Structures are given as C-alpha cells and as structure tokens.
Amino acid sequence: MKRSDVFLRPEYAPHRALWRASGLIDEELRRPLIGVANSWNEIVPGHVHLDKVAEAVKAGIRMAGGTPLEFGTIAVCDGIAMGHEGMRYSLPSREVIADTVEIMVEAHRLDAVVMVTNCDKITPGFLLAAARLEVPVILINGGPMMPGVYGKERIDFKDLMERMNVLIKEGRTEELRKLEESALPGPGSCAGLFTANTMNMLSEAMGLMLPGASTVPAVEARRLWYAKLTGMRIVKMVEEGLTPDKILTRKALENAIAVDMALGGSTNSVLHLEALAYELGIDLPLEVFDEISRKVPHIASISPSGRHFVVDLDRAGGIPAVLKELGEAGLIHKDALTVTGKTVWENVKDAAVLDREVIRPLDNPYSPFGGLAILKGSLAPNGAVVKASAVKRELWKFKGVARVFDREEDAVKAIRGGEIEPGTVIVIRYEGPRGGPGMREMLTATAAVMALGLGDKVALVTDGRFSGATRGPAIGHVSPEAAAGGPIALVQDGDEIVIDIEKRRLDLLVDEKELEERRARWKPKVKPLRRGILRRYAKMALSADKGGALEY
C-alpha cells in the first residue's frame, strides 16, 4: 500500500474533490503520486532551463505509470549574490529549501519526490530534505555550463572575476565588456569544479542520482534523457520501497568524500556534508575528511585547480569512471546501495576512463594527497579547510604577518587600494555562520588578490567561506568563529601566523599569556539585525565544523 491510498477511502471525498479541482481524475489518483520539486526560476543561469528538465522528468513518471505533481522552491545564484550584503542569504537558503520540500511532500502525502536541482545551495538543501523524508527520492541536476571562449582560450567565471580587477584599474572597459560577454555562454551551473558541480557529483557518488547524470552538459539532449530515466526510475522505487535511509549511510558519505578528494572539489562540500551528517544523526568529525584526504590521490585537475572543465570530465567517463578507479584500489565502499537498486560497484564496474589526461591513474596523480585538507592549530582548534589542489606546492608552508579586517568589504578595499604588502596574512573575521550572519563567500577578496599579482605572496584566513572558484592559499571555515570567541577574534595586526598544509596546521604565534589578556578585554561584536531569516539564522546556526546547520 502506498501512502497516497489514504485519499481513496470513502471518508476522504473532500480531499478528492480538491485534487479534482486541480485537474486530476480517478486514474491519476490511483497511481503513485510523485512530487517534482523544481527549483526553476528566471534569475539563476543554472536554473533557467529547469522547466524543460522538469517536463522530461514528468514525462518519465507518466511513462512508468505514476502521476507527476510539480511544485517549486527557491534558488539563489551565489555569483549574483557575491560581494555584497545579499551573500548573507545564500547559506541560510539551504535550510529553507529543505524545509519547503519536506513541507510539500509531507503535507500532501506524496509517495515519492524527484528533486530538480543544479546550483550551490539548492543541491545541499535537497540532500537535507532527502535525509528527513521516508519516501523514495532521486535528484536530477540541470547540468554544467559549457566553458566560454575568449579568443582562442576557454574561460569561466573565475577568469572573469580575477581579470576584472586589472582591466578596471587600467581603464580597459571595452576589453572587460568583451570578457563579460564571453565568460558565461548559456544555461547551466558554472563550467568549473565550483560548489554547484561539486555537490551534484557528490550526490551521484552517494547514490542519490542516476550513474553518469551529474556531469552531462546542460545544453545536451542527454540531459533530457537522464531526466526521463529519472522519472521512470522513481516510480519503480515506490514499488520497491527504496527510501533514502537505505542509501544515505555513513558509507555513502565516505564515498562522497573520497570522490571529493579525487576531484579536488569545493571547500563548501565539507560544510554541506557535515550538515547532511548532522541531519542524518551520523557523527562525521573533520578528521574523517583528513584521513580520506591522506589516502585518496588527486587525479582530476579541473578549474579552478587546472585547465580542464566539467565537460572534459564528462567526456572522460564522468563520475562512474572516477568511482571505478577508486573502487579498484579499495578506496570506496563498493557495497553502498544506490537509487538504481544496485550497489555502487554494480553500477560502475564496467565504466572506463576515456581520457587519461583528465582522469589520471592513481599511480600518476596530480598530487598524492586529496584535493582538500583540514587544518587545525592554535588559530583553528576545531578546524579549518583549504582547497590544497588549488594552492601551489611552494605555498603549502606560509608564514606571514596578520592584517585584520572585521568585514569582507574593508579587506577588498585595502587589497584594491594597494595596501596589502607581500608576506601578509589577510584575516577576515566576523563572517562566520552566526557572526556574519550567513557565512559569506570571500571570492571578491581572493579574486582581487590573484588579479593584482599577490596570489603567491599573501594568504587569506577567514571564519567565512570561499567560492568553489577560489584558488591560492585561502583558508576558510576557521572554527570556532570570531563571534563565538574563537582565537581568530583575538588576532591583531602584526601577529605572525603560520600555515602548513602538509602538516595540517594553522597557528597563531602569540604566547598564551598575551592571548589571555586579549581575551579578558574582548567583547563580542553584536550586529543589529532586523526581523527576518538572518536574525533567526544568527541565533540557531551551528559552527562551520558542524556544517553551519540549524541546531535542533
């Protein structure tokens, strides 16, 4: 018995009348009622085409004998929200998305749901919703954008962000306009391995997306093929009773981390996987990420770490090929269940790597270590995260003098104004989950650093986040955050800070007695917040090492 059968009982005549008022007939009510949670809107370039993806999903549901019922949820474009107050709303939107899907599915007793996703916080929000639901769930993404072409060069959002600063400074407005018109050629999630594509790939690695689906470009017909197959598969999952609790296990999370390390994904993936683990009630300390990072080599160098794009990874075999490589070396849990009803290994055992320059063999990796590293030390007792694959090896150890800012805007002004000297560690604090609130991304700051030729001369440390497009020695998610009284709140201009990625250390070279005196004088900065979601998030958000999730 499916749970929507409740509407077929005689005493549910008023409910059936309401369904009929929406246009449904008896035959449709007798079939599985399948929700299609669509994050389409006309704002986000990664989502403008999701209406077509959702239509293909619904076609697949009908072909398999189900009744599709589409509803919407919100989606924020992190790129459009970047570099201003709007970025405070991005991370809190993750929980709102999870809430909206949970409410719609549970309130209307739907039998299953397909989640149509693509960009940064939408996929993590859907994953949190899946963790809460007791009905079958599949995700289908809208696919990556193709890289832009500027002259003979392939480019992406990162290139525009970094080059913009120099072009503006030199007054080359026409060249900036041409670059702006070339960087993002059409629909899809930004072409590099930024947060959106990272989280879609990890959803596939965890088994919540059909094998091969996550990397198919937005503009290809295969995107609609996968959408139809997803719609067909969800109906079968209702018959099988295949629910997320059977798929979203510790093994699935560890498989996702292994793929993340092999690819060198966005540092935001750590935040979102920690939030998912919290939602699932699974203890996932940051040390697990570090343990896996030390075992899994970095075998795919995709922008911003390298010159390849997600479309190249797709052509090389996609996530099935990556999982096959890791599986043959015993670096994933082969027996983890997936939405196909089969194990990960059953899905990928026949996959092949089609381009060894894009996906290297494990014995010839880009780096013997995973793409992300967890740092701890006197400046980050509970941890911090760096995209090690995007840091030149000669910068893995960096000792510098602190220049402290209490908001991103002040740091950006100083960088663009030529106030930052080589050997500086730029510290941006009070940008954490509660202190921000909202834990903004610092891409504007890091892009300015790279553009002005400081990328190998300075480092940046923050209790905020970084965009997946960030490269260079940028250390984020410093925990505890400044607003919670973490050591980062006590840093002063002129203090020495040591970053050692190989030893996984982040240390403030100030003696304990001096820190105690500073702590005695420290007072938390309280930002006035009007009523609304930021005020609520500031009160309820956990620290970055817990994913910035809302505390239950």
Curated annotation (Swiss-Prot):
Record's keyword terms, sorted: 2Fe-2S, Amino-acid biosynthesis, Branched-chain amino acid biosynthesis, Iron, Iron-sulfur, Lyase, Magnesium, Metal-binding
Gene Ontology terms: cellular component: cytosol
Catalytic activity field: (2R)-2,3-dihydroxy-3-methylbutanoate = 3-methyl-2-oxobutanoate + H2O; (2R,3R)-2,3-dihydroxy-3-methylpentanoate = (S)-3-methyl-2-oxopentanoate + H2O
Cofactor(s) for this UniProt protein: [2Fe-2S] cluster; Mg(2+)
Pathway annotation: Amino-acid biosynthesis; L-isoleucine biosynthesis; L-isoleucine from 2-oxobutanoate: step 3/4; Amino-acid biosynthesis; L-valine biosynthesis; L-valine from pyruvate: step 3/4
Biological-process GO terms, alphabetical: isoleucine biosynthetic process; L-valine biosynthetic process
UniProt EC number: 4.2.1.9
Keyword Chloroplast: no
Keyword Amino-acid biosynthesis: yes
Chain residues that bind [2Fe-2S] cluster: C119, C190
Residue positions where N6-carboxylysine is found in the record: K121
Cofactor, free-text remark: Binds 1 [2Fe-2S] cluster per subunit. This cluster acts as a Lewis acid cofactor.
InterPro entries: Dihydro-acid_dehy_C, DihydroxyA_deHydtase, DiOHA_6PGluconate_deHydtase_CS, ILV_EDD_C, ILV_EDD_N, IlvD/EDD_N
Active-site residues, Swiss-Prot/TrEMBL: S467
SUPFAM superfamilies, A to Z: IlvD/EDD N-terminal domain-like, LeuD/IlvD-like
EC class: lyase
Positions with a binding annotation for Mg(2+): D78, D120, K121, E441
Molecular function GO terms recorded: 2 iron, 2 sulfur cluster binding; dihydroxy-acid dehydratase activity; magnesium ion binding
Role played: Functions in the biosynthesis of branched-chain amino acids. Catalyzes the dehydration of (2R,3R)-2,3-dihydroxy-3-methylpentanoate (2,3-dihydroxy-3-methylvalerate) into 2-oxo-3-methylpentanoate (2-oxo-3-methylvalerate) and of (2R)-2,3-dihydroxy-3-methylbutanoate (2,3-dihydroxyisovalerate) into 2-oxo-3-methylbutanoate (2-oxoisovalerate), the penultimate precursor to L-isoleucine and L-valine, respectively.
Family to which this protein belongs: Belongs to the IlvD/Edd family.
Subunit structure: Homodimer.
Protein name in UniProt: Dihydroxy-acid dehydratase
Lineage per the UniProt record: Archaea, Thermoproteota, Thermoprotei, Desulfurococcales, Desulfurococcaceae
